[in-house]
Protein backbone atom coordinates (compact mmCIF):
# COMPACT_ATOMS: atom_id res chain seq x y z
CA UNK A 1 0.00 0.00 0.00
CA UNK A 2 1.47 3.32 -1.04
CA UNK A 3 1.30 6.59 0.86
CA UNK A 4 -1.21 7.94 -1.63
CA UNK A 5 -3.65 5.10 -1.00
CA UNK A 6 -3.19 5.42 2.76
CA UNK A 7 -4.02 9.14 2.55
CA UNK A 8 -7.22 8.32 0.61
CA UNK A 9 -8.32 5.81 3.25
CA UNK A 10 -7.63 8.20 6.16
CA UNK A 11 -9.38 11.06 4.33
CA UNK A 12 -12.42 8.84 3.67
CA UNK A 13 -12.60 7.84 7.34
CA UNK A 14 -12.31 11.50 8.49
CA UNK A 15 -14.91 12.63 5.95
CA UNK A 16 -17.34 9.87 7.00
CA UNK A 17 -16.82 10.83 10.67
CA UNK A 18 -17.51 14.48 9.87
CA UNK A 19 -20.72 13.59 7.99
CA UNK A 20 -21.85 11.39 10.91
CA UNK A 21 -21.27 14.24 13.41
CA UNK A 22 -23.20 16.72 11.26
CA UNK A 23 -26.12 14.29 10.84
CA UNK A 24 -26.17 13.66 14.61
CA UNK A 25 -26.14 17.41 15.32
CA UNK A 26 -29.02 18.08 12.92
CA UNK A 27 -31.01 15.11 14.26
CA UNK A 28 -30.61 16.39 17.83
CA UNK A 29 -31.94 19.77 16.81
CA UNK A 30 -34.92 18.28 14.98
CA UNK A 31 -35.93 15.52 17.37
CA UNK A 32 -34.82 16.81 20.77
CA UNK A 33 -36.05 20.39 21.07
CA UNK A 34 -34.94 22.52 23.98
CA UNK A 35 -37.75 22.12 26.51
CA UNK A 36 -36.27 24.51 29.02
CA UNK A 37 -38.89 26.97 30.31
CA UNK A 38 -37.90 30.55 29.68
CA UNK A 39 -38.45 33.11 32.40
CA UNK A 40 -40.30 35.92 30.71
CA UNK A 41 -40.41 39.49 31.92
CA UNK A 42 -38.28 40.64 34.79
CA UNK A 43 -38.19 40.17 38.52
CA UNK A 44 -38.25 42.92 41.08
CA UNK A 45 -36.47 42.26 44.32
CA UNK A 46 -38.62 43.35 47.24
CA UNK A 47 -37.15 43.76 50.66
CA UNK A 48 -39.14 42.40 53.53
CA UNK A 49 -39.73 44.99 56.20
CA UNK A 50 -40.88 44.54 59.73
CA UNK A 51 -44.51 45.31 60.47
CA UNK A 52 -45.03 48.51 62.40
CA UNK A 53 -47.65 47.78 65.04
CA UNK A 54 -48.08 51.49 65.77
CA UNK A 55 -49.03 52.30 62.18
CA UNK A 56 -52.21 54.25 61.64
CA UNK A 57 -54.76 52.95 59.19
CA UNK A 58 -55.87 55.44 56.57
CA UNK A 59 -59.50 54.94 55.67
CA UNK A 60 -60.43 56.39 52.32
CA UNK A 61 -63.82 58.01 52.50
CA UNK A 62 -66.15 57.79 49.53
CA UNK A 63 -65.86 60.73 47.17
CA UNK A 64 -68.88 62.93 46.54
CA UNK A 65 -68.42 63.17 42.79
CA UNK A 66 -70.95 65.98 42.12
CA UNK A 67 -69.28 68.12 44.81
CA UNK A 68 -65.79 67.50 43.43
CA UNK A 69 -67.01 68.22 39.89
CA UNK A 70 -68.27 71.66 41.02
CA UNK A 71 -64.68 72.74 41.72
CA UNK A 72 -63.13 71.06 38.66
CA UNK A 73 -60.64 73.05 36.56
CA UNK A 74 -60.52 72.18 32.85
CA UNK A 75 -57.17 73.95 32.36
CA UNK A 76 -55.58 71.75 35.01
CA UNK A 77 -57.30 68.76 33.38
CA UNK A 78 -55.65 69.69 30.07
CA UNK A 79 -52.23 69.29 31.73
CA UNK A 80 -53.11 65.93 33.27
CA UNK A 81 -54.57 64.58 30.00
CA UNK A 82 -51.14 64.94 28.38
CA UNK A 83 -50.26 61.62 30.07
CA UNK A 84 -53.14 60.00 28.19
CA UNK A 85 -51.94 61.20 24.78
CA UNK A 86 -49.17 58.62 24.70
CA UNK A 87 -51.82 55.93 24.12
CA UNK A 88 -54.96 57.86 23.10
CA UNK A 89 -55.93 60.53 20.59
CA UNK A 90 -58.29 63.43 21.32
CA UNK A 91 -59.16 64.17 17.69
CA UNK A 92 -62.66 63.66 16.32
CA UNK A 93 -62.55 60.31 14.51
CA UNK A 94 -58.85 60.35 15.37
CA UNK A 95 -56.68 57.31 14.99
CA UNK A 96 -56.82 54.62 17.61
CA UNK A 97 -53.40 54.21 19.14
CA UNK A 98 -52.71 51.72 21.89
CA UNK A 99 -56.10 52.79 23.24
CA UNK A 100 -59.21 54.16 21.48
CA UNK A 101 -59.61 57.86 20.72
CA UNK A 102 -61.17 59.91 23.54
CA UNK A 103 -63.19 62.35 21.43
CA UNK A 104 -66.64 62.80 22.98
CA UNK A 105 -66.04 60.01 25.52
CA UNK A 106 -68.23 61.55 28.24
CA UNK A 107 -71.71 60.17 27.60
CA UNK A 108 -70.51 57.69 24.96
CA UNK A 109 -71.36 54.00 25.23
CA UNK A 110 -68.56 51.84 26.58
CA UNK A 111 -66.59 49.85 24.00
CA UNK A 112 -68.42 51.64 21.16
CA UNK A 113 -65.55 52.51 18.80
CA UNK A 114 -66.12 49.96 16.04
CA UNK A 115 -62.59 49.92 14.60
CA UNK A 116 -60.89 49.33 17.97
CA UNK A 117 -60.44 45.88 19.53
CA UNK A 118 -61.30 46.25 23.21
CA UNK A 119 -60.19 43.83 25.90
CA UNK A 120 -62.82 41.35 27.05
CA UNK A 121 -62.99 43.16 30.41
CA UNK A 122 -64.04 46.46 28.81
CA UNK A 123 -66.26 45.00 26.09
CA UNK A 124 -68.43 43.16 28.64
CA UNK A 125 -69.06 46.26 30.83
CA UNK A 126 -72.02 47.87 29.10
CA UNK A 127 -73.46 51.28 29.94
CA UNK A 128 -72.10 54.72 29.19
CA UNK A 129 -69.05 56.68 30.31
CA UNK A 130 -70.74 59.12 32.69
CA UNK A 131 -69.00 61.05 35.49
CA UNK A 132 -69.30 58.21 38.01
CA UNK A 133 -68.02 55.50 35.66
CA UNK A 134 -65.16 57.64 34.36
CA UNK A 135 -64.28 58.62 37.92
CA UNK A 136 -64.05 54.99 39.04
CA UNK A 137 -62.17 53.91 35.91
CA UNK A 138 -59.64 56.75 36.00
CA UNK A 139 -59.02 56.21 39.70
CA UNK A 140 -57.91 52.60 39.22
CA UNK A 141 -58.59 50.97 35.82
CA UNK A 142 -57.50 47.51 36.96
CA UNK A 143 -60.05 47.53 39.80
CA UNK A 144 -62.88 48.92 37.69
CA UNK A 145 -62.36 46.41 34.87
CA UNK A 146 -60.20 43.50 36.05
CA UNK A 147 -58.37 42.09 33.05
CA UNK A 148 -58.26 45.36 31.11
CA UNK A 149 -55.25 45.77 28.84
CA UNK A 150 -54.90 49.39 29.94
CA UNK A 151 -51.66 49.44 31.92
CA UNK A 152 -52.20 52.91 33.43
CA UNK A 153 -52.11 52.74 37.24
CA UNK A 154 -54.72 55.44 37.71
CA UNK A 155 -55.07 58.96 39.08
CA UNK A 156 -55.00 59.05 42.86
CA UNK A 157 -56.35 62.55 43.60
CA UNK A 158 -60.13 62.94 43.21
CA UNK A 159 -59.75 66.59 42.19
CA UNK A 160 -57.36 65.64 39.37
CA UNK A 161 -59.85 63.08 38.08
CA UNK A 162 -62.63 65.68 38.15
CA UNK A 163 -60.37 68.11 36.26
CA UNK A 164 -59.72 65.50 33.56
CA UNK A 165 -63.43 64.68 33.20
CA UNK A 166 -64.34 68.38 32.89
CA UNK A 167 -61.61 68.88 30.28
CA UNK A 168 -62.90 65.90 28.28
CA UNK A 169 -66.46 67.28 28.47
CA UNK A 170 -65.37 70.73 27.29
CA UNK A 171 -62.93 69.49 24.64
CA UNK A 172 -65.81 68.44 22.40
CA UNK A 173 -67.00 72.03 22.26
CA UNK A 174 -63.51 73.51 21.82
CA UNK A 175 -63.00 71.86 18.41
Swiss-Prot record:
Residues 30-175 are periplasmic. Its main location: membrane. Residues 1-8 are cytoplasmic. It is a single-pass type II membrane protein. It is found in: Cell membrane. Gene3D superfamilies: Cytochrome c-like domain. GO terms for molecular function: electron transfer activity; heme binding; metal ion binding. Heme c binds at residues 84, 87-88, 150. Binds 1 heme c group covalently per subunit. The keyword Transcription does not apply. InterPro entries: Cyt_c-like_dom, Cyt_c-like_dom_sf, Cyt_c_1A/1B. Disulfide bonds: none annotated. May be involved in electron transfer from bc1 complex to aa3. Belongs to the cytochrome c family. This is Cytochrome c homolog. It comes from Rickettsia typhi (strain ATCC VR-144 / Wilmington). The gene is cycM.
